[in-house]
């Protein structure tokens, strides 16, 4: 159940949404007979590797960033991994590496550029994005307006929560 006006558990604030940023996971498969289209990440390799680098289940929900990415304010300390298309991520205005564990702190600003190559990047989060599962998946299906964050792409002002989990360094 979502707590109203309790922002203490929020991890990210979307300051600028980018062209198409959605919550995705492995997706809903094998439900077509019920009229449910296939959903989920499009680059399974980048998505799975991001979650593996965080030492978590392969199916933890992430943000899928299409074309140009969002600007996100960090509201609570956590770890992330950015994979997929080379979106030239910046943390507080400084270029930051992809495909590696990044510790982000409260007040940090994360931004993404237009990809140098490819079109989809993934921001995997320690614990995964906390949204409800529908038919076994947290993926957004825009066509049906279900899953993910209220069944839609992220918008400016959206507050995103992650699933609570000890930091990667504490688990080592």
Residue ranges with predicted function:
Residues 1-169:
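Conserved "landmark" site that anchors the functional core of diverse proteins
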């Amino acid at each position: 159940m979502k707590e109203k006006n309790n922002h203490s558990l929020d991890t990210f604030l979307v300051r600028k949404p980018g062209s198409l940023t959605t919550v995705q996971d492995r997706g809903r498969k094998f439900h077509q007979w019920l009229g449910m289209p296939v959903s989920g990440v499009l680059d399974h390799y980048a998505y799975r590797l991001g979650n593996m680098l965080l030492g978590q289940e392969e199916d933890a929900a992430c943000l899928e960033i299409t074309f140009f990415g969002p600007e996100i304010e960090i509201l609570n300390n956590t770890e992330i991994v950015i994979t997929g298309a080379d979106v030239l991520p910046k943390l507080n205005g400084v270029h930051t590496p992809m495909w590696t564990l990044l510790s982000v702190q409260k007040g940090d600003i994360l931004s993404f550029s237009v990809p140098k190559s490819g079109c989809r990047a993934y921001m995997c989060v320690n614990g995964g994005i906390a949204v409800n599962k529908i038919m076994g998946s947290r993926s957004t299906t825009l066509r049906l307006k279900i899953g993910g964050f209220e069944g839609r792409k992220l918008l400016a002002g959206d507050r995103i929560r992650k699933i609570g989990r000890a930091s990667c360094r504490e688990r080592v």
